[in-house]
Each structure stands twice: as structure tokens, then as C-alpha cells.
């Protein structure tokens, strides 16, 4: 069973690790068999599985259902599950919803936001619910950002993101996802935090990498983000593509410069 202790050890050893989104038992089993030890049941399922144009319509019930499916397929992986949009607006709501995801099989819940979430993170941790933070491009805030844009490019934004990351760690977060930020900022955050940092569109400097499974397998086609790579394009079956993904992350080949933001 992969645990957060393994990820901490890998960070200390500077050993890169690979993660991916998963939404059903069949793909979760295949991913686990190819060596992926960390999976995320992301609210990205609203776009990849349900056909919405954002993650906002996803419900807690959706997340619970897919978390159960993935856990059945990959019983030994470290499994993260997103708390969906507006499911952590109050302390009571947050604790109840996080408990539902944990009962469904999650090892950790992920929520989007900065320092304003400190009390929430602290409260969850005190109640034995491990927390993964998510900074940078946070898709639930798409209407605030005015679209899916790179974050932290100016000095003010970069300093704020770093401060948010420190605050989340101090509040008890055990893991952090960093999305769509410049490589230099990702390097600062990864170096300054003692907790593992997983990047997506954040360069090869983070402790681990994650991709949406449809992007990694070329299913999204022309709509795939620039930081993604189609690992199925080189030929072979899905299992071979996943093995390439794992191998390229662990050897530092992915993400390359063309998959990163300067």
C-alpha cells in the first residue's frame, strides 16, 4: 500500500513519482499494473467523463461514486479525491463531505485555494482527514480567472502563491498540487516546502507529476493543454503508453521544455 510516507521519502531521495487521474475500476487497475502508485479522482470528470465545459457541475455524489470505482480497481494505490465546487463552504459541510469521500475509499481529499483555507485544512487534519492543497490554476475558480490561464507570472502573484503554499503546509496539508505556473516559481515552492509537490504544467522541477488520463492517452485531441503529452502516439497499447509516461517522469524526460511555462 502506497502512503504519504512513501512520497515524503521519495522527496528526500529526489526520486520522481508519477500520478494520473482515474475515474473507473478498469483504468485504475491498468494504471496500477503499470506502476502508477498515486491516483486522483478529479472533478475533471465533469469535463472528461460528463461532457461539461468546466468542473463546476460536478456533485459530491459524482465524486463518491467514482472514488468507490477507482478504489476497487486499485486497492493499493494512494488515492486522492477532489472536494467539488462549493462542497467545503462551511466547516460542518466540509467535514461531512470529506468523511463521505474517505468512506468511499480515498486516502486524502484535495481542495482548491490558498491561505483562506487554513482553518479548513487544520480542522480536517485534526479530524484525521489528510489534505492535499491545490494552487496555481485552480479550475473551480475559472470564472474569477477569466479562463484557464497561467498563474504566478508576475512577482506579486508569485510571492502570494508561495505564501499560500507555506500557509497550507503550516495548517497541516500533507501534499500540494501546483498547476500551470512558471518553472522558476514551481522550483521555489518545491524547494521551500517539506511536503511533496505534484506538478501539472509546472515543469520537471516538482517532486511528482500528474496528468489527466485522457490527455496522456491523446483522447482529448486538439483540445489537450500544451503541457500534456500523448504517450499513445508512439504506438503500442494503452499499457505501453502508461509505462512510457511513468518511465519518462522517473527519468526526468517529461515534462520537457515544450510542456512547461517560463
Curated annotation (Swiss-Prot):
The keyword Metal-binding applies. GO terms for biological process: pantothenate biosynthetic process. GO terms for molecular function: 3-methyl-2-oxobutanoate hydroxymethyltransferase activity; magnesium ion binding. Binds 1 Mg(2+) ion per subunit. Mg(2+) binds at residues 43, 82, 112. Transmembrane segments: none annotated. The keyword Magnesium applies. InterPro entries: Pantoate_hydroxy_MeTrfase, Pyrv/PenolPyrv_kinase-like_dom, Pyrv_kinase-like_dom_sf. Pfam families: Pantoate_transf. It comes from the Bacteria. Pathway: Cofactor biosynthesis; (R)-pantothenate biosynthesis; (R)-pantoate from 3-methyl-2-oxobutanoate: step 1/2. Keywords: Cytoplasm, Magnesium, Metal-binding, Pantothenate biosynthesis, Transferase. Gene3D superfamilies: Phosphoenolpyruvate-binding domains. The active site is at residue 179. It is found in: Cytoplasm. Belongs to the PanB family. Catalyzes the reversible reaction in which hydroxymethyl group from 5,10-methylenetetrahydrofolate is transferred onto alpha-ketoisovalerate to form ketopantoate. Homodecamer; pentamer of dimers. This is 3-methyl-2-oxobutanoate hydroxymethyltransferase. It comes from Sodalis glossinidius (strain morsitans). The lineage of its organism: Bacteria, Pseudomonadati, Pseudomonadota, Gammaproteobacteria, Enterobacterales.
Amino acid at each position: 500500500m502506497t502512503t504519504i510516507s512513501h512520497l515524503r521519502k521519495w522527496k528526500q531521495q529526489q526520486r520522481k513519482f508519477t500520478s494520473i487521474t482515474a475515474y473507473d475500476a478498469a483504468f485504475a487497475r491498468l494504471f496500477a499494473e503499470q506502476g502508477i502508485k498515486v491516483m486522483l479522482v478529479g472533478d475533471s470528470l465533469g469535463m472528461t467523463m460528463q461532457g461539461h465545459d468546466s468542473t463546476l457541475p460536478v456533485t459530491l455524489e459524482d465524486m463518491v461514486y467514482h472514488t468507490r470505482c477507482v478504489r476497487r480497481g486499485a486497492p493499493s494505490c494512494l488515492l486522492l479525491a477532489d472536494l467539488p465546487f462549493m462542497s467545503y463552504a462551511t466547516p460542518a459541510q466540509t467535514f461531512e463531505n470529506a468523511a463521505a469521500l474517505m468512506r468511499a475509499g480515498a486516502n486524502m481529499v484535495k481542495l482548491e485555494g490558498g491561505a483562506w483555507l487554513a482553518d479548513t485544512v487544520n480542522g480536517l487534519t485534526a479530524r484525521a482527514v489528510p489534505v492535499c492543497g491545490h494552487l496555481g490554476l485552480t479550475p473551480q475558480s475559472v470564472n474569477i480567472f477569466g479562463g484557464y490561464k497561467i498563474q504566478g507570472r508576475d512577482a506579486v502573484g508569485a510571492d502570494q502563491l508561495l505564501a499560500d503554499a507555506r500557509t497550507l503546509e503550516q495548517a497541516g496539508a500533507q501534499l500540494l498540487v501546483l498547476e500551470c505556473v512558471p518553472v522558476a516559481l514551481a522550483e521555489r515552492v518545491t524547494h521551500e516546502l517539506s511536503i511533496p509537490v505534484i506538478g501539472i504544467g509546472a515543469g520537471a522541477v516538482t517532486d511528482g507529476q500528474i496528468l489527466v488520463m485522457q490527455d496522456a492517452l491523446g483522447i482529448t485531441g486538439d483540445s489537450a493543454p500544451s503541457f500534456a503529452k500523448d504517450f499513445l502516439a508512439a504506438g503500442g497499447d494503452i499499457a505501453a503508453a502508461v509505462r512510457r509516461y511513468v518511465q519518462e517522469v522517473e527519468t526526468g524526460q517529461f515534462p520537457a521544455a515544450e510542456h512547461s511555462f517560463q
